């Protein structure tokens, strides 16, 4: 077997990232903070249950920050249900509990389902913590199940690239 194609280092890297991701993404206090939204314009359609923010959209909630060209929030009475952000790229960051380093991510589209707490980074997706990096065309993070999937495991079409810096685990 060609040592450059040996599956164990890739499997180990994916396992390490999967094990560290729930800790990296868990932000216990952010969901209880108020949401602040700034944009060039907003269109609220109560009949459809959507709010569409366009132009230099900035959303902040606790340590969470989302920057996008366009954000569509789908909601039921009084409660957001789903957030779809798009940009070139759309960006987010959040500060994990017990950490000084932000988790950051970029993708052409970010989709967050509030009920299931699933975040999907779609199109040139990248997830970072410190110098560790996770790249694929699609990354799915399920906060409830504490599972990260990328590439084929996340119904993506490209391979996954994981970079883990030594001495950070």
Features from the language model and the residues they span:
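Mature-chain termini and adjacent capping regions
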Residues: 1-169
């Amino acid at each position: 077997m060609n040592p450059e194609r040996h599956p164990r280092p890739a499997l180990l890297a994916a396992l390490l990232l999967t094990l560290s991701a729930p800790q990296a993404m868990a932000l216990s206090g952010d969901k209880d903070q108020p949401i602040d939204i700034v944009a060039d314009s907003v269109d609220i359609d109560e009949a459809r249950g959507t709010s569409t923010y366009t132009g230099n959209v900035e959303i902040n909630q606790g340590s969470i920050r989302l920057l996008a060209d366009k954000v569509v929030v789908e909601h039921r009475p009084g409660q957001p249900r789903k957030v779809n952000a798009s940009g070139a790229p759309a960006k987010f960051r959040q500060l994990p509990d017990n950490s000084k380093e932000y988790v950051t991510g970029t993708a052409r589209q970010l989709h967050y389902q509030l009920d299931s707490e699933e975040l999907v980074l779609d199109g040139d997706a990248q997830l970072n913590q410190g110098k560790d990096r996770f790249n694929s065309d699609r990354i799915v993070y399920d906060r409830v199940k504490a599972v990260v999937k990328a590439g084929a495991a996340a119904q993506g079409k490209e391979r996954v690239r994981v970079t883990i810096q030594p001495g950070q685990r």
